[in-house]
Amino acid sequence: MQKNLVIVESPAKAKTIEKFLGKDFKVLSSYGHIRDLKKKEFSIDVEKNFTPSYEIPADKKALVSTLKTEAKEAETVWLASDEDREGEAIAWHLYEVLKLKPENTKRIVFHEITKSAILKAIEQPRDIDLNLVNAQQARRILDRIVGFELSPVLWRKVKPALSAGRVQSVAVRLIVEREREIHAFQTEAAYRITAVFLVPDTDGKLVEMKAELARRIKTKEEAKAFLNACQGASFAIDDITTRPVKKTPPAPFTTSTLQQEAARKLGYTVAQTMMLAQRLYESGFITYMRTDSVNLSEFATTGSKDAIIKMMGDRYVHLRHFETKTKGAQEAHEAIRPTYMENQSVEGTAQEKKLYDLIWKRTIASQMADAELEKTTATITISGSSDVFTAIGEVIKFDGFLRVYRESYDDDNEQEDESHLLPPLKKGQKLEHGPIIATERFTQRPPRYTEASLVRKLEELGIGRPSTYAPTISTIQQREYVEKGNKDGEERQFNVMTLKDCQIKDENHTEITGAEKAKLFPTDTGTVVNDFLTEYFPDILDFNFTASVEKEFDEIAEGEVKWTSIMKNFYDKFHPSVENTLAIKTEHKVGERILGEEPGTGKTVSVKIGRFGPVVQIGTVEDEEKPRFAQMKKGQSMETITLEEALELFKLPRTLGEYEGKSVSVGVGRFGPYVLHNKVYVSLPKTLDPMEITLEEAEQLILEKRQKETERHIKKFEEEPELEILNGRYGPYITYKGSNYKIPKDIVPQDLSLASCLELIKLQDEKGPATTKKGRFAKKK
């Protein structure tokens, strides 16, 4: 009989832990949850105190059977799933499904995968915490109620196949509201006045000192008048203040701050950061990655101290204890940190190494001395004016934690990173001025959310928890309520007036403004669903209500309230509002917007959500003639499209002429404008407008596509039509029966025979599964 069976969540973790525990322990993985609510059913008996109905998915039945057999043969079963609510629920489901007995079942937890942590956990087992299980179950059931009851409402009122989630809907609302703020924003112009003064340095050599007027000037006329007044004015130092400034290091990483900083510094998505952090954790390199605690253990602070002294000396050490300030912080474990502070780097992929380096630096910096700076401010008066210029100098006297780590910001161009020292100055000193420049600047609209800034906003509002941020952001994109994308900037003119050598030079310049990268945009479907839910289910979309539900989950976890009473209070209000909304008859289809009338016919022109997305419609179902529909162009929005733009869409598709005896037309589809010839679609580049493209330009695009296709197909074999040698993005490869196979670099693809191809396929199949045509990163089922 096997003495001990340890069950963890992931196979990677199982391998690592088995090495620590020795021959008396067998470690197996549950591969996450082994059962869940039934997928196609409501699975909750409301009448019986919200009793859930769980099932073991088909792909987990063989695994569960294996675990049952192993559990029966073991003297003791150790449930070692993660130390959060989700992990506690996994342990409880294992206990129930495997029919374990309390006398030979032990629950153990650890927040780092090291030998000492695992052995300590074995020495300190506990029971399954049913309060944590109930908190997870309450979240799961509440989310099922919302999703299962709201989705049919959306199918009937908005569009088939839509779905709604509790936290996801609030996240979409934030993005929709930000988009509307941006469209409503009115840019205001003002002039920023800067001056260069020539001041002698310690060697008597004139150096430039930059200063800025303490206020912005509203109009060009005022700015010009100010420059004119400066022509005959004298300038002098009125006051000089020097004060010490200290900068304190940021706290160690929580889940959300790691997601934010990895996005800003490394360009990682929220999901990517969590995947890499999971790997680092399972390899034993970092502590548990789902936490809202900023606390460090004594082991970590001592390790940090030793590493700092060894690398930089005693002066750089300042041990700190950080307090968690997040609303409803629930996790008892530590911040995310390296398991051993002396390990400045680890083995792994390039991405894993970069993330580890970020975590190590942030943790070390948190236990380092403040940076000490000296800030000097000089006020410069202008004769005959109450206005003053201000020159600011800042110099680092002691770098402290900045030697290791500098925090990033969402808008890095707002951050002055260079320290500079002002030249020697004294009160009353007369100054000679160089150029004085008035530059027209504009107020900036609110920025769209990035994944990282959305996480920060959700955390500020107390919505979601460390385990829910990444799934929430992934889900709203998968449902196509939100899309991540880039926006090209627009050209804008601005005015610059320069006073130099007693003359004012007036010039207009151009700049590109408003360019954005990897930002979250609401789709038309997302906007319509948001507006519908906000109108008919205001509680679900209310930030405070959603945060209060999170607080109730925390109270369940603490054992302060019964989870069933929370469910009842919610359901008794929510369910009637669902039934009432289903009964309401609306005059127009939800989300429909009337743009005006078609000239000549007087028919109504509108935009609405159609079966395949947003469409423009001319006419109504009540008219004698059937309505006409046109798909909107990529980049057009239901909220902003004009009548003129809508009518233009009905000019497409248009026929350009014939090429090689076949018709050539241009149109717009779901993925943008295209040319169609002989059943072959060719995408239009951004430089060509579908309303203006000529037949000759279309012919060129057709020929270019053919050339690319010719270059792509290297070799085919008549005797094996399913096998082909192709040229891909990463070089030549063999495709065969839905799988792709690499061709070694030292082989010329054109020289390969069918037998050689089949031999390469056989060799690679023996090593492991080939890449499918779905792509390297296709989800495993």
Where are these regions (language model features)?
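A conserved hydrophobic secondary-structure block that centers on an alpha-helix together
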Residues: 259-261, 265-272
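Intrinsically disordered, low-complexity regulatory segments
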Residues: 1-141, 149-150, 214, 409-413, ...
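Short active-site loop/helix that positions an aromatic residue
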Residues: 16-20, 92-93, 172-179, 361
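Short acidic, hydrophobic short linear motifs in intrinsically disordered regions
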Residues: 237-241, 248-262, 287-291, 445-457, ...
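Metal- or metallocofactor-binding catalytic centers and their adjacent structured scaffolds
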Residues: 217-252, 426-432, 439, 544, ...
